[in-house]
A protein has these predicted regions:
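N-terminal alpha/beta PP-like core and its mobile active-site loop of ThDP/TPP-dependent enzymes
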Residues: 5-333, 361-364
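Active-site diphosphate/adenylate-binding microenvironment
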Residues: 16-29, 34-37, 42-49, 335-405
Length: 408
């Protein structure tokens, strides 16, 4: 097999090489892989084409977790390479997390040759059906002549909006048949912008009596946007909060500190019970993680007025800039978190002592992978004043993400 693959490079470009070259040309330069027989031509192309770094994962869930962490931090997609339907299935848990985080990823999933599928070999599966619940874009590339264009479309889809998962299915004969082109990158559709009418309505709500909360996620949790939100808070007295689990949250010393809506339902209800106006920035109305007997699913009071400032697919940074201009807050100073760190504790190892150690020893620009759901909430106060860092949470609630998320 190896000698055959190596000798194939003496022949005209095949579909696999066409796809890899297209990915590189479109800015995808890392591929996290767990391949099998059907993907060997793609593996050979990864080795042959300059500009693509190949990272092997020994389990598909690790592969998809690494792609999630990479996309969250690099703000651009990587590629995965997975082995048919079962391989994709093994990676679904962390693709679920990645979808909730709005992480850009291009999944390349190998398949049997198109003419072999009808024989229902052991690994034959409905790959498109498996991919759809975690993908915003799914396509099977039926011909080596089409694979370059399909690859460019997949990258465009992954880069669209706040970030999406695009799954491109690569039949073995599409990979090994002769190809004739490398596709140019496709323009990504611009994100929609907040309207002037919405800006006016949000500004008015912020100036009214009663407690107002701006609740956010996504790109609103980056340092520059938080700085503007801090100025809005300084002028209007509003509260700022984020979802319980966010794809990437820049926090720590020197940054604007905001609340996180807590996981335990009773605590979350207490946090929100006094809110009169809720402004949603990339989020939906806060809801409970699970349903509980005699407790509400929606966490805000019935009397709370809800304003949709921008949904997650919109340009959140622009929305905040426009609101800051409308309120004329640029001469106001945001309240930034002072540097402080907890003292190290001795004695028995507890969640509190671990949190103290993390807050005390965390280096500057650390990346924290938080896959906790229960005990981990106690880490927030102990790390709030630590060195500036990025907090990557378990956005989809599917545990097992932590190590792969930061192994990038």
């Amino acid at each position: 097999m190896l000698s055959y693959l190596l000798s194939s490079w003496e022949n005209p470009m095949n579909g696999a090489e066409s796809l890899v070259k297209t990915l590189v040309k479109s800015g995808v330069d890392v591929c996290f892989t767990n391949p099998g027989t059907s993907e060997m031509h793609f593996v050979a192309a990864l080795d042959h084409v300059e500009g693509m770094r190949c990272v092997l994962g020994l389990f598909e869930g690790v592969v998809t977790g690494m792609a999630d962490g990479y996309g969250r931090m690099a703000d651009k997609p990587s590629s995965t390479l997975l082995h048919l339907g079962p391989g994709l299935g093994n990676g679904l848990a962390n693709l679920h997390n990645a979808k909730k985080a709005h992480t850009p990823i291009v999944n390349i999933v190998g398949d049997h040759a198109t003419y072999h599928v009808e024989y229902d070999a052991p690994l034959t599966a409905d790959i498109e059906g498996i991919a759809k619940p975690v993908s915003s874009w799914v396509k099977t590339s039926k011909s080596s002549k089409d694979i370059a264009r399909d690859g460019a479309e997949a990258v465009m889809a992954a880069r669209s909006g706040p970030g999406q998962i695009a799954t491109l299915i690569l039949p073995a004969n599409t990979a090994w048949d002769e190809a004739n082109s490398v596709a140019n990158p496709l323009d990504v559709p611009p994100q929609s912008k907040i309207s002037s009418e919405t800006i006016t309505a949000i500004a008015k709500a912020l100036c009214e009596d009663g407690e107002t909360l701006i609740h956010m996620t996504g790109r609103a949790l980056r340092e520059d946007t938080l700085n503007l939100l801090g100025k809005i808070q300084s002028k209007t007295g509003c509260r700022l909060s984020c979802m319980t689990s966010n794809g990437r949250w820049q926090r720590g010393a020197g940054r604007v500190a905001i609340e996180r809506i807590q996981y335990p339902i009773d605590i979350a209800l207490k946090q929100l019970e006094t809110v009169k106006n809720l402004i949603l920035l990339g989020t939906k109305v806060p809801v409970a993680f699970f349903a509980y007997p005699n407790k509400p699913s929606v966490l805000i009071p019935d009397s709370c007025r809800v304003f949709q400032m921008a949904d997650i697919d919109m340009d959140l940074g622009y929305a905040v800039e426009a609101l800051a201009d409308e309120l004329d807050v640029h001469n106001h100073q945001p309240k930034k978190q002072e540097y402080s760190k907890p003292e190290l504790m001795s004695g028995k190892l507890t969640s509190e002592s671990i949190a103290c150690a993390l807050g005390n020893l965390m280096p500057e620009n650390a990346i924290i992978a938080d896959e906790s759901v229960s005990s981990g909430r106690g880490f927030m106060p102990f790390t709030q004043g630590a060195n500036p860092h990025d907090w990557l949470a378990l956005t989809g609630g599917s545990i097992g993400l932590g190590l792969s998320l930061i192994h990038i």
